[in-house]
Amino acid sequence: MSRVLARLCAVAIAACLLFTTWSAATPKQAAALDPTVGYLMAHFTGESSTDQQIYLAHSTDGLRWTDLNNGGLVLRSPIGTRGVRDPALVRSPGGDRYWIVATDLCIACGQDWSNAINNGSRSLVVWESTDLVNWSAPWLLNVAGAIPDGRNAWAPEAIWNPDTGDYVLYWATNVPLNGAAKHRIYYARTTDFRGITTPQIYVSRPGNQEIIDTQIVEVPSGVGAYRYVRASRDAQITLEGSNSLLGTWTNLGNLSGIGLTGAQVEGPMWMKVNARNEWVLYLDQYASGRGYLPVLTTNPSSPSAYRLPASGSYAMGGTKKRHGSILNLTAAEQNRVLARWPAAAVNRIQSYNFQDRYVRHYDYDVRIDPNVSPAQDGQWRVVPGLVGSGTVSIQSVNYPGHYLRHYGYDFRLEANDGTATFAADATFRQVAGLANSSWTSFQSYSHPDRYLRHYAYLLRLDPVSDAQSRADATFRVTS
């Protein structure tokens, strides 16, 4: 008996040690990740069937973004409604697994908003990866089917909960409850995004007030009074704080003090700035159709600490950025992502009849100069056009998201504001050179009888009618 007891004790001790090792290592693995150096944004771009897919963008500073895959979609959903919106990027605590979890919704794919609200997909679309570049086939995760009369599942988010050792997955579902049919935030727990616990109400506003978009950020000790801050779009952009993901949340106020309410913006998206205690809360300017706007803060729990960025201090890239999420990247992750989806080549644009001069921007004006300094002011990426097929746009290297754009037939370097007018004015057809067919000319998309040309060294959009103007409108795209 004593020998049996000894063996049982040994087994019990080993099991305890194994459990202790596992339970201690799992939450702490997040702290063992290498330092983060860059940022990856997953998003959708608009309302067409192609726009409602997964797009990626990269940034080194969190404010100036470059579209990956030359602005093309990266993942397409072939399941459910065959479209996705509101993607959430999720990393495992150990950094060895990633998920994209998105709304299964495609307006313009045969479903209108009324059906999407009242009889939409009850599932989310999920992809899984071990390296951020090779993704599994997607699957549907039914999250609202277990909610009595749950009518859809929108805007998913997920965050690791160290208190329970799994993820809190939360989303919005339209449910008639207590006399009010409206969207509320539900949550469930999951370890693998294939199965979930029974959904519970997470956030519900009083009366008929809906809430659809909410995202949580974890804040380090010493910054504000709360470990977690939640930004939600209801009638306002409301901030709430808690020291436990599944505990009580305290209303901290909203962003109306800087002129932002739920009538103008939605889709709050947090980003922690690498290596310092600063945060960016991106908000989707849905009412004006301008895409994401960054709002800056050094204390997420204090509404008075938020400020709008200076003009020209951010650039969102060539595609419109709609509701998504941002993942801070380690150097290894960043290298993999950029190797898989490299940015377009960096080029200079040389004048045909002044071959010592190159197109450059200077104080947002555009001209041809010799000996361009700093060199990056004369470096460009010729990328797929912002509008039309078989077209190009010319994007600045040191001001990502800024393009050569004509206005009043004069050229300036301007940030893409997401409008159709900007897209047309910043798009060209790259044709054989008008003065030499081995060179290149840029025909305006919005004014096809006019070409990009220099006049007195300044770039203009003019008709071309003689040998001089043909030479002025001829360039070489070179390294």
Regions found by a protein language model. Give the residues of each.
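N-terminal export and membrane-targeting signals
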Residues: 1-12, 25, 29
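C-terminal region of N-terminal signal peptides and the immediate post-cleavage residues
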Residues: 17-33
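Short, exposed beta-strand-loop hairpins at the edges of beta-sheets
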Residues: 317-318, 461-467
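Acidic glycine-/aspartate-rich tracts in secreted/extracellular proteins
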Residues: 246, 299-302, 364-365, 409-410, ...
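Carbohydrate-active catalytic/glycan-binding domains of CAZyme proteins
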Residues: 31-346, 427, 437
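Extracellular glycan-recognition/adhesion modules and their associated mucin-like linkers
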Residues: 225, 231, 334-365, 382-410, ...
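Short coil/turn motifs at helix boundaries and re-entrant loops, enriched in small/polar
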Residues: 59-62, 129-132, 190, 297-300, ...
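Short polar catalytic/cofactor-binding loops
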Residues: 43-50, 61, 353-357, 364, ...
